[in-house]
Amino acid sequence: MYKHILVPTDGSDLAQSTVAKAIEIAKETGAQITVITVSHPFHASIIEPMRVKDTLDTHDRQAEDTAAAILGRASAAARAVDVNCSTVHVRHESAHVAITEVANQNGCDLIIMALNRHRGISAVLHESETVLVLKHCTVPMLIV
């Protein structure tokens, strides 16, 4: 059935439940999973030039620490049930682009994502990353 499942996560409760579901599906099908988290690069727009390096270093360190914690939890959950799991941390302006690129580069045959529904004016102004991946990626998706 599926051989390689990509699971994007931001560490939220909703994303963590999606990771758990992906692990369950991988266990049932014998698939391996790749868990990805995407962090945005640092932008130094109004920071004093002398402080940019310190701020950049702090931002990078925090992004790495956060990603390591998120991916570590996912990897441990997969290992606990003997599911082959790799992890990827990508810095990119657009999470949906990074997700699509990693899915294609790794030969993933399924992406499992949660749908975080926006309501009211927010729904008009913001498309969810899930919807953007659906629009731009040719890899089949399971929305949970």
List the predicted regions and their residue ranges.
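Small/aliphatic-rich secondary-structure junction motif
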Residues: K3-D54, A77-S86, H136
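Short, well-ordered secondary-structure micro-motifs
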Residues: T18, S45-E48, V97-T100, A123-L125
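Short, hinge-like loop/turn segments at secondary-structure boundaries
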Residues: M50-D54, A103-N106, E129-V131
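A short acidic, glycine-rich active-site loop
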Residues: D54-A69
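Structural beta-alpha unit
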Residues: A76-I111
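Glycine-rich, Arg-bearing micro-motifs that act as flexible, cationic patches
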Residues: L110-H136
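Short, flexible loop segments at boundaries between secondary-structure elements
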Residues: V139-V144
